[in-house]
């Protein structure tokens, strides 16, 4: 079956959609990390002519809903009135077909759990799901994962912990995170996770993640940040460049080199963890290689090299597991009545070829993908997109 990416930021962006399609993804969930369209009806209408892959959307809390109600300060908690406004906007988005409310708590460190819980309860009441980019107060902070567990337990909502290895990029941190999540699961919490094939994460330079105080707390150095978009793409950060871009181009994406490689595979030692890309809105030749290489790398590293899982289990993680987790009854399987979304690949050669800006080509197509089909029609032949309008909007 076609691969299902539960955590991305395509949101109708064609260049990024083609990268997803070329690596075998046929369905992608956008609006993650608290960043999404607010007017879902208008967004869905804008996609009426089709897209590279099938798209499902969450409505985002931590950037989009907060900004829509006038909350521009990432360090200020919402008032009760602002929470009610966000609930009304989220309800409207879910009535239009959004799959739930997403959170990017790292990006609004001042938001109180009260508002998160309120939106979680709304999402649960409407049958939605809450992906959560957890809030890290330090690199070794486990309170962040407890917020995800509490959201599931207190709000009664299904929670998807986003890009697990980015949040907990050391093996011992993952052990602690798994222990806390499984404690909650044993008490009835419905929690799953997704994770990527890199520990080096990307975020906008102007976000709270890269505030100087937070960089000091996390012990990140300027020369560990690689610019991945814009006119300085491929350059390593300096203090002067940091100050210039924060002032003049805060949306510039940078990659923070952190974590340990062993954590990548270790994140998939639990059977409720599925692969994801965290792909952003990238113009050609720009961005993080995860947008072009994640799923092929998952198969190469976890199956062919490390033999951590066999082929049937790896395929399940990339197809049936996300379909069942998200409630996609016609996706993730090849059976009578299911949607004819599928990918044909060579298990001996499948691999990601993209690399970081300045070190390689961020959008290089993968190896080993023979063809990709959506709805019974061919979308990809080898490394060429032959039809980028087969994807449909999937409403909750």
Language-model segments: residues:
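Divalent-metal coordination cores built from histidine and acidic residues
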Residues: 8, 14-102, 189-191
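Divalent metal-binding pocket/active-site signature
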Residues: 92-148
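Acidic, glycine-enriched loop/beta-strand segments at the rims
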Residues: 255-258, 264, 306-315, 323-362
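Active-site beta-loop-alpha junctions enriched in small/polar residues
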Residues: 9, 13, 33, 60-64, ...
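C-terminal cap of metal-dependent C-N hydrolases
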Residues: 265-272, 277-278, 342-390
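Active-site neighborhoods of metal-dependent hydrolases
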Residues: 58-59, 71-80, 84-106, 163-307
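Metallo-beta-lactamase
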Residues: 2-10
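Divalent metal-coordination and catalytic microenvironments
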Residues: 7, 24, 55, 97, ...
């Amino acid at each position: 079956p076609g691969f299902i990416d539960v955590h991305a930021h395509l949101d109708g962006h064609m260049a990024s959609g083609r990268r997803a399609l070329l690596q075998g993804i046929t369905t992608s969930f956008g609006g993650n990390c608290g960043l999404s369209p607010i007017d879902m009806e208008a967004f869905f209408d804008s996609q009426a002519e089709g897209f590279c892959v099938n798209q499902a959307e969450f409505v985002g809390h931590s950037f989009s809903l907060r900004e829509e109600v006038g909350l521009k300060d990432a360090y200020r908690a919402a008032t009760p009135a602002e929470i009610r406004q966000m609930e009304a906007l989220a309800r409207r988005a879910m009535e239009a077909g959004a799959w739930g409310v997403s959170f990017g708590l790292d990006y609004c460190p001042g938001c109180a759990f009260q508002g998160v819980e309120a939106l979680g309860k709304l999402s649960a009441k409407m049958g939605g799901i809450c992906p959560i980019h957890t809030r890290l107060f330090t690199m070794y902070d486990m309170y962040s994962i407890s917020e995800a567990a509490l959201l599931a337990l207190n709000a009664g909502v299904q929670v998807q912990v986003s890009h697990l290895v980015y949040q907990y990029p050391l093996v011992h941190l993952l052990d602690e995170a798994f222990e806390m999540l499984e404690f909650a699961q044993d008490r009835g919490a419905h929690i799953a996770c997704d994770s990527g094939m890199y520990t080096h994460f990307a975020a906008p330079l102007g976000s709270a993640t890269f505030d100087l105080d937070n960089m000091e707390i996390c012990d990140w150095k300027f020369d560990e940040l690689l610019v991945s978009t814009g006119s300085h793409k491929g350059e390593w950060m300096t203090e002067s460049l940091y100050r210039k871009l924060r002032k003049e181009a805060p949306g510039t994406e940078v990659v923070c080199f952190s974590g340990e490689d062993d954590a990548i595979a270790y994140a998939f030692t639990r059977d409720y963890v599925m692969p994801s890309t965290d792909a952003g809105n990238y113009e050609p030749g720009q961005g993080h290689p995860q947008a072009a290489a994640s799923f092929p790398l998952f198969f190469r590293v976890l199956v062919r090299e490390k033999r951590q899982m066999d082929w049937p289990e790896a395929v399940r993680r990339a197809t049936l597991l996300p379909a069942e987790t998200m409630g996609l009854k016609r996706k993730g399987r090849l059976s009578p009545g299911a949607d004819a979304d599928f990918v044909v690949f060579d298990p001996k050669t499948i691999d990601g070829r993209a690399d970081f800006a300045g070190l390689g080509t961020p959008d290089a197509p993968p190896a080993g993908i023979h063809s990709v089909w959506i709805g019974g029609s061919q979308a990809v032949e080898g490394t060429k997109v032959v039809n980028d309008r087969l994807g449909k909007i999937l409403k909750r």
